[in-house]
């Protein structure tokens, strides 16, 4: 965790985080879990275990990721992930909900004054998790579904039918064929079991010429005609942790799921940490460093850039990173770079 905190602090000092302010001074923090190891033969004491269809034991490791996101930026800023593993001496599997408690508590401890809006899917829209967020002074935009939040949807529809809710339609500013349709109700009970826990309900449809997309969220942010579009953008932005983060880590050259060596203790989790740390550094460079951006454009992809970097490290004597990036952009000039003949 200290390595992530050090890089994050450097980004703060460089005012990088100012680009990620989303709403009323708050930052969007997306949380989601993913698996990075599974096997029926290789295991360690910290593997979670489940039975396959044939009663064969399947061992696996997962992690919970947390990344700062913004609708207008492709790059994300990962925080230190939380491994989902069995602790020493434990017989029960760890789970995403417990990992979220640890990750959120660590995040608040390390960043006590960072204003955060947590964005998650419908699995997180439960009373214990929302109470955890409230205790840590974090706001939320959480997906909800009729199947798991029947009473909430019923109350929202009843309030709208009685004229106690609000509606708004607006044409998209960039594409007149698209209409944004909002319906919202404030101060509803989360469910029948937790009537004291009040939330605001937002129903949104994006109506286009070929299809209509439908989303629903709960939030504790104020819902008004001036805020619903922004909050919708924040809720839909959650996909960045799935696509821009986990998909990139698994399929775009970082090889998060590759078994570099499982070890007998925490080696698998350490490799996952190091992969996420490398991803953090790359994301910040892609967002802020003109030389890195030029080098990436010159080499067409991150894989191409990494291949060229490895080659230059093997054959060139480099004094600093600036020299490396100039070589990646313009080629190794004989007058500025010495070949390593040792």
What are these regions (language model features)?
Residues 90-149:
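Domain-level cores of phosphate- or acyl-group-handling catalytic modules
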Residues 225-260:
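Short amphipathic alpha-helical "interface-anchor" segments enriched in bulky aromatics
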Residues 169-172, 177-186, 250-342:
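A short, flexible helix-boundary coil/loop motif
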């Amino acid at each position: 965790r200290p390595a992530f905190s050090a890089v994050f602090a450097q980004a703060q000092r460089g005012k990088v985080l100012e680009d990620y302010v989303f709403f009323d001074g708050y930052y969007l923090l997306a949380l989601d879990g993913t698996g990075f190891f599974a096997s029926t033969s290789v295991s360690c004491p910290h593997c979670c275990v489940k039975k396959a269809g044939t009663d064969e034991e399947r061992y696996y490791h997962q992690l919970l990721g947390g990344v700062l996101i913004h609708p207008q930026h492709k790059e994300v800023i990962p925080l230190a992930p939380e491994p989902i593993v069995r602790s020493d001496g434990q017989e029960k599997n760890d789970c995403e909900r417990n990992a979220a408690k640890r990750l959120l508590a660590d995040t608040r401890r390390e960043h006590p004054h960072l204003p955060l809006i947590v964005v998650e899917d419908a699995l997180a829209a439960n009373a214990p998790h929302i109470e955890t967020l409230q205790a840590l002074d974090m706001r939320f935009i959480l997906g909800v579904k009729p199947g798991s939040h029947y009473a909430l949807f019923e109350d929202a529809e009843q309030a709208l039918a009685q004229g106690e809710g609000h509606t708004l339609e607006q044409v998209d500013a960039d594409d007149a064929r698209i209409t944004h349709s909002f319906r919202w109700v404030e101060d509803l009970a989360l469910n029948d079991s937790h009537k004291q826990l009040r939330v605001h309900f937002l129903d949104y449809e994006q109506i286009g010429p070929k299809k209509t997309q439908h989303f629903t969220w709960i939030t504790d942010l104020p819902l008004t005609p001036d805020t619903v579009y922004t909050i919708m953008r924040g809720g839909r932005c959650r996909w960045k942790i799935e696509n821009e983060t986990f998909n990139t880590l698994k399929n775009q050259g970082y090889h998060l799921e590759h078994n570099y060596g499982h070890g007998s203790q925490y080696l698998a989790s350490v490799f996952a940490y190091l992969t996420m740390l490398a991803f953090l550094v790359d994301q910040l460079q892609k967002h802020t460093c003109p030389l890195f951006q030029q080098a990436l454009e010159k080499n067409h992809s991150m894989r191409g850039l990494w291949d060229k970097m490895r080659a230059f490290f093997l054959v060139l004597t480099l004094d600093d990173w600036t020299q490396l990036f100039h070589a990646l952009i313009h080629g190794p000039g004989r007058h500025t770079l010495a070949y390593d003949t040792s």
